[in-house]
A protein has these predicted regions:
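Alpha/beta-hydrolase superfamily serine-hydrolase fold, recognizing
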Residues: 3-368
Length: 368
């Protein structure tokens, strides 16, 4: 799910165009055409996102272990592991799940950001997983649980601390991370969903949720191109046009199942993202009502310039830098491990004149 400015301008511009195609009969008969159209919009936005961020990452020394097959030699999904240059072992683990409305995206889309996070002294895992319509619910959830098992089983080999794990995700990845956290911390939920959690509750120290989708009753009522796009994606992901009536939709709804056992949470969303008012803020409120420690980061509705979906990856923006530094502070708090000292990133990453010159072309490409 992306309403984006970068990933932000993508859905806002792209979903409006896609909504116009919704009148085509093919889009009503089968989820595949809609899913592939939405996937195309997201893929274009994600490529531009990586292009903009990667050259502007400070030179942290990070060891990269790419393409680790967590399902064994026969399993296609893989994960990437980014390790900081430090003798301090074992390292707390951040397991990041990428977004893409359950129908698009890849771990490569968030890799530059994860390298920055690893530079602060944490082992950061970017997990790839099967997307729909090729794979439907609950394939992704079970794969992500297997990835969690892989991290624990290979902790000694890579110098990881299996007792200090933080789940994380953006957009649909935030929903998947929250669902996995429910399975780890709530045995009744795990039993109902058929997930045998790969970690004990005490090993999960916290969760990072950026711009997620959590309440599917709200999605069913959501107006405009964003609501249209999400409902088409859920048709594809659940395998049913009547997705709201499926067991999958019930399992995926986080507020319905969360209780006081849910892990400490950092939750963030931009004021220009439709999902903030309908999803992130209500979940933050609900978790606090339940007594869960919550760090909230939101902006006033009239804040300018508006912060779109997944603005956190736009490291040229001071608000994204603030989000990153608050993320690191949250990791320090929940893991009990101090971050490595770094030069303030705002001194290293700037919005150069050449990037400003690129913006009109980027926006035109996204709109097309």
């Amino acid at each position: 799910m992306k309403i984006f400015s970068l990933a932000g301008a993508g859905l806002a511009a792209g979903a409006a165009a896609l909504a116009g195609l919704a009148a085509a009969a093919a889009l009503h008969r089968h989820p595949l055409p809609s899913a592939l159209l939405i996937r195309g919009v997201f893929s274009s936005a994600n490529r531009l996102q990586v292009k903009r961020i990667q050259p502007r990452i400070p030179g942290f020394t990070v060891t990269r272990h790419r393409g680790l097959r967590y399902l064994g030699t026969g399993g296609k999904p893989s994960l990437d592991l980014f390790l900081p240059a430090t003798d301090r072992k074992p390292l707390p683990v951040v397991m990041w799940i990428h977004g893409g409305a359950w129908i698009s995206g890849s771990k490569e889309d968030v890799a530059p950001y994860l390298e920055v996070l690893a530079g602060y002294g944490y082992a950061v895992v970017g997990v790839g997983y099967s997307i729909s319509p090729e794979a439907v619910y609950p394939t992704a959830v079970k794969e992500l649980n297997a990835a969690l098992a892989f991290v624990r089983e290979h902790a000694d080999r890579y110098g990881l601390d299996p007792n200090r794990i933080v789940l994380a995700g953006d957009s649909a990845g935030a929903q998947l991370a929250a669902q996995l956290a429910l399975a780890v911390t709530n045995p009744e939920y795990a039993r109902d969903t058929g997930v045998v959690p790969a970690a004990a509750p005490g090993q999960l120290r916290g969760i990072l949720l950026n711009c997620g989708v959590f309440d599917f009753d709200a999605v069913a009522r959501m107006a405009g191109p964003v609501g249209w796009g999400l409902r088409k994606a859920l048709w594809s992901y659940t395998g049913s046009k009547n997705w709201k009536a499926t067991p999958a939709a019930g399992h995926m709804s986080i507020p319905e199942h969360a209780d006081h056992r849910f892990p400490p949470t950092y939750i963030c969303g931009g004021n220009g993202d439709n999902l903030t008012l309908t999803q992130s803020i209500p979940l933050a409120d609900r978790l606090q009502e339940l007594g869960v420690p919550v760090v909230r980061q939101f902006w006033p509705e009239d804040y300018k310039p508006a912060l779109g979906h997944e603005f956190q990856f736009q490291l040229h923006r001071p608000e994204a830098m603030d989000s990153l530094l608050r993320t690191v502070a949250f990791l320090e708090d929940v893991t009990g491990v101090s971050a490595l000292p770094r030069r303030p990133l705002e001194k290293v990453i700037a919005l150069e004149e050449d990037l400003l010159a690129e913006l009109p072309a980027i926006e035109e490409k996204l709109a097309a």
